Amino acid sequence: MTVNKYRKKPAVIEAMKVPQQAGTPEADDLFYWLQLGLGSDVTYRADGAVEIKTLEGVMRADTGDYIIKSVQGEFYPCKPDIFHATYEVVGDA
């Protein structure tokens, strides 16, 4: 069996960063975006975290994490270091 190398295909995704505080314009924008895509499948925690129902189960996005909307339309959290190593800004949605 041969080990092959693969490069991730370029795909444009949408993403938003979980803000440090609830009740801010940024938090309101995130809430609206997630409600449009997930409806009742999103929960906001008192500590500012967001829980998202995904195909793999409920996943938590802490403040400072990113929430990604994949090419297939699924939402999932991503830690900042992984996000910045994987994605670059290409423009506004």
Where do the language-model regions lie?
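N-terminal domain-onset segments
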Residues: 1-55
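Short, compact, well-ordered microdomains
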Residues: 54-93
